[in-house]
Amino acid sequence: MKPYKIENIRNFSIIAHIDHGKSTIADRLLESTSTIEQREMREQLLDSMDLERERGITIKAHPVTMTYEYEGETYELNLIDTPGHVDFSYEVSRSLAACEGALLIVDAAQGVQAQSLANVYLALERDLEIIPVLNKIDLPAAQPEAIKKQIEEFIGLDTSNTIACSAKTGQGIPEILESIIRLVPPPKPPQETELKALIFDSHYDPYVGIMVYVRVISGEIKKGDRITFMATKGSSFEVLGIGAFLPEATLMEGSLRAGQVGYFIANLKKVKDVKIGDTVTTVKHPAKEPLEGFKEIKPVVFAGIYPIDSSDFDTLKDALGRLQLNDSALTIEQESSHSLGFGFRCGFLGLLHLEIIFERISREFDLDIIATAPSVIYKVVLKNGKTLFIDNPTAYPDPALIEHMEEPWVHVNIITPQEYLSNIMSLCMDKRGICLKTDMLDQHRLVLSYELPLNEIVSDFNDKLKSVTKGYGSFDYRLGDYKKGAIIKLEILINDEAVDAFSCLVHRDKAESKGRSICEKLVDVIPPQLFKIPIQAAINKKIIARETIRALAKNVTAKCYGGDITRKRKLWDKQKKGKKRMKEFGKVSIPNTAFVEVLKME
C-alpha cells in the first residue's frame, strides 16, 4: 500500500437503477486507474456471480481500492459498490455510511427511475456529496438537458457538476475520476484514538473463514489485535490478518487506519457471528459508544422449500447451509408437510432475494425443488390478550380464539409514463391500495405514492405493473406499519381431505376468487381416478367453491350381448357400490406437477 494520508482518501459509492450502466462504469474506472491489467479485464468485473451478469444486477456489495495520480498527488479511491434493489436497502444504507460521496448514474435516455430515487434519499440522509452522471450519452434518444431538469426539480440536486459520459466508449471517465477527487470530501480526521470500524459486509472463504469488510472510522486495526463487536456484545477474536481489495482480496502487512477500507480475518466460522452495521473495537482499548444506525436484519417474506424427490432432502439441507454461509439474511428452519414431505421454511428480505436463492439452488446444486407460495408475517391478536406472529398457514389458530388479525403495509413509489395512469390506479385498487399523492416528474412521467399490503406486493405486483405499463413502470417500497385486516385461512380439500400445501392466508374479499381459481387449476392437472373426486375450497369448514374430477368410465356391460335389462342393472349397481367403497377407502394420487402448477399460479 502507498504512504498513508487521510486527506488523499476518497470513499464513494455508485447509485443507479437496474440497467443504467453501474457495473460498466465501474469497469471503466478500474481500467482508467490501471487497477487491473487489460488482459485480465472482463465485463462486469465486480459482479462475481453468473446470475449477476445475466440479470445485469448487483446482489452482493463488492468494494475495490484504486490509486490515481492528480496534480502531483497520489489518491486512494475506495469504491464501495452496492446492491441496487429495494430488498437490500439496509445493506445499501450501511455501505453508504462507509462513504463521503456517491455517483448518481442516470440513463440519459430513460431518466430517473424508482430504485435510484430510493437510494438517493438514503444518500441524502447521510449528507453525502452526490455527483450526477448521465450515462449512455452516445445514444440517439439521449436527452441530457431534460434529464438534468428532472434531477434538479424532483430530487433537488444541483446539476452544475453533472458529467456526461458513455461507459461504452469511455467518454467522460477521466472527468468522473477528477470530480471524485475535487468534490467528494476526504474522511474527517478522527476525534478519538480508540478503534471504531464499521462492518458493511462479510464473505465466507473456504480457506480462511469469514472475511469481514470494514471502513475504519477511528484508530487502527492490525494483525494480532484482539477485537470484539459492540452491538452484538459477543466473544472476542484475534485478528489473523488484514487486507485490501486490489481488486481481488489481497492480504497485506501493516494496519488499516482511519478513513481506509479493507477487510480482516479472525477465527470466525459463521457469517451469522458478523452483523452488517455493527462496530468493531479492540478489547484492550474499547470505544465508548458504537456507531449509529445498527439494526438486526429481519426476513420479510417466507416460503417453504421442498425437494421434488424426497431422497434429495440431505442435498437440499447442504445447499441451503452453503448459501447461508454468505447470506446472513437467509433464515432456515426444518419443517414437514403431510403432502410434500420434509423440507425447510425459509425467510427472505424480499421477492428478488427469494428468486435468487431458488435459482441458485437449482443451478449450483442441480436440485429440483417445489416452493410454496410466498407469505408475510401476520400479527394475530387473541381474545385472551396474547399476540402471535405467524408466517405459515399451518400455524393459524382456531378462528374462535381470534380477536383480530393485522397485516404489514408498505409505502410504494411508482414512476410511470402519464398514459398508463388509469391502468396503474386500477391495479393498485385491485391490490387494496390507498393513493397518497401524485407528482409530476417531468412533462411525460408521474410519481405515484401508494400504501399497499405487503402480501399484495410479494405475489405478482411487479409482473402486473410491467404488464400494464408495457415495461415502462418501475417501483420501490419501504416497510410501513401493521394495520387491521380481514385475513382468513383458505383450505383446499381433495376428496374431503385438506391438503396443507395448498392452504394459504388471504384477505376475505379475495378468498372466493382465489379458491375458485385453485380448484379450476387442480381439475386440469390431477388425472381422473376410478371414482369421482370433489375438489373444494373452504373457509372455517364452509365450502365456498367446488369442482369435480369425473371418474374414469368403464363399460361393465360390454360382455352382455343384448339380453335382459335387469342383468345390466345388476352389473351397474355392483359397479356403483364398488366405486362408493373406493371413494371411502381409496387414496387420491396427486402428481408433483399439480403442486408445481398451483404454487406457480399462487
UniProtKB/Swiss-Prot annotation:
GO terms for molecular function: GTP binding; GTPase activity; ribosome binding; translation elongation factor activity. The keyword RNA-binding does not apply. It catalyses: GTP + H2O = GDP + phosphate + H(+). The keyword GTP-binding applies. Residues 7-188 form the tr-type G domain. Keywords: Cell inner membrane, Cell membrane, GTP-binding, Hydrolase, Membrane, Nucleotide-binding, Protein biosynthesis. GO terms for biological process: positive regulation of translation. Its EC number is 3.6.5.n1. It comes from the Bacteria. It is found in: Cell inner membrane. Its main location: membrane. It is a peripheral membrane protein. It holds the Pfam family LepA_C. InterPro entries: EF-4, EFG_III/V, EFG_V-like, EFTu-like_2, LepA_C_sf, LepA_CTD, LepA_IV, P-loop_NTPase. One of its GO terms (cellular component) is plasma membrane. Belongs to the TRAFAC class translation factor GTPase superfamily. Classic translation factor GTPase family. LepA subfamily. This is Elongation factor 4. It comes from Chlamydia trachomatis serovar L2 (strain ATCC VR-902B / DSM 19102 / 434/Bu).
